[in-house]
Amino acid sequence: EEDRFNKIKHFNPDSSPIPSISFVKQCAYHYFILKKFKNINFDCVFISTYDRNNDQWEQEIINNILEQVTCKKWVFNKMHHEHHAVCGFYFSKFNEALILVSDGGGEVIPSFNKTKQPYQTMESICFIDNKLKIFYKAASNYRGGIEDKKNDYKFKINETDILLTSKAISGLKYLNYTQEAGFGNHQEGQLMGLAAYKNKNTSISKSLLNIANKAQEETLEEKINLIKKAKKYSDCKNIILTGGYHLNCSNNFKLVKQFPELNFFVDPIPYDGGTAVGVALYEHYKK
């Protein structure tokens, strides 16, 4: 949310493609938004992350933030998809719900496979009533490239079904199509909009329209299958959609039409800003 205060659209202090430079920039950045709270002594500051898979880096970034606020204590964890889920559940006002999180990244799931790129969670199925239960997570190491490619692997961590894959799935798949179409970060909405022109009389190139259509259709089918999977875990009729992928209002609408028997709610903050709400609520209510 920093860009709302420093007036730099899509601002990201760690946007450099070189990880070491990204890290240095984020550790040195002074947040405009935190200046608004300089005279407040918070009872607790809760910190969320998409998981950089480097605890030392995470800690130094946290230290930079803590130098800019006053608080009695602070809490940090890497439950990225759970924070998305809790945020969506809070705004839904449901008493119970199945939450589907679809994202371009998230917390790392450890693997016995030695890979250059860790497996980052891309999809989750959770259930919340008065407790949070995680039924399923799918994680991908696709960003590691061909040398990192492994066969799909399924197993359990406690009660959670885990899928590890080297395929591009969920928000990562959509991001890949966005880049293939020549768009940059945060321009997924441009691709979504183009898909509506697939069979129209337009000067937009057919190749571009085909990419946009593939992105919409393939990921829609993926989400339909994820909802079907969720229904096998619980007969709850309340479904919450969250995670950055569900900024895709066009496919959200199609999902609602596909399953008229279900009660849908789309998280109003499905992008990563919502995890700040989610972590605070999770830590406050988990007792």
Spans of features found by a protein language model:
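Short acidic/glycine-rich loops and adjacent helix/strand connectors
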Residues: E1-K287
